[in-house]
Amino acid sequence: MSAALDYPTTRYDPAPLVDLSARDERARLTESALRAFFNIMATWSIRDADARALLGGVASSTFYDYKRNPARVLDQDKLTRISYLIGIFKALHILHGAELADRWVAMPNRNRIFGGGSPLDYMTRGGTPAMQTVRRLLDARRGGG
C-alpha cells in the first residue's frame, strides 16, 4: 500500500501562456519586441543585412520601416525569432561580462555546433532552429537546461 503524496503548492499563480497565434497578443508584444531587437543588434554591432536575416530575410524597406515605426503587428515567426535573440542576449550577460557577452555572437567559436564559424553565421544560415539550438546551449551552460 502506498501513501498518497500531495502535489507541492505555491502561493504564486503561474504566468499565463503567451498565444502568438492571437493577433491581439502579437499586437501587444510587437512594439517592445522590435525595440529590444534593434537595441540588441546595436549592442552586438550587427550589420543590417545580418539583422534582416535574423528576422527571416525581410526586405530592406520593411526592415527600415520596422525601425522607424515599431507600432505594428509582427507575425508569429518574427516574434519567436526575437524571443530567442532576447533569451540569447540575457543568457550571455548571465554567463559573461558585458564586453565578452556583446562580442560573443560575432566571434569564431570552436564548439562543434558552429564548426569554427561564429554563432551569428550559424543563426543567419540556420534560422529559427539554429537560434533555438544556441539558446539551449547557453541555457545549459548556465545550468538551466
Locate the predicted segments by residue.
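Non-transmembrane "mature" sequence context
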Residues: 1-145
